[in-house]
Amino acid sequence: YVQMGKWCDKEARYPQRTPHQFVRQLIEAGVDFDIAGVQMYFTKQLLADCVLMIERYQGLGKCVHLTEVGSPSAGMTMEFADQEEIPWSAQPYEWRRHWDEELQADWLEAVFTVANSKPWIEAANWYDFVDPYGYLKSGGLLRSPQGEKKAAYDRFLRLKQQWQVQ
């Protein structure tokens, strides 16, 4: 929205700031806070670009929480729960190939591995837990409320065990 000068689908009424600019300006204004929350949904960018974006927060001297991490396991990233179905099979790939459960697990593992490698990132949270009730239609770690696990769920548990996180 910042690059487009918009508030969702409306024209912005005043100059926009990126989240990083906003946090930096809070610090410059002397606002007392401990943690910067960053959302990291799949952004159609290379993972390296996402890492660079996250690393910009390190220079601000605040702990970071990745408050919302997410990607779909089918369809398009922009296919939100409240929109009509998009003919995604006719669309270009967003990241490596069309989204599927294994690619969602790869994205989860990549982002959480980056977060685990940065001591100033104190927490990372996967946003959608169960389909179809999430922000992304297929963004959950479970396929349904009945508890059918996706590859990303198993990958998350494996990482947790590997890193000995409680």
Description of each model-found segment:
Residues Y1-W88:
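Noncatalytic carbohydrate-binding groove/subsite architecture in carbohydrate-active enzymes
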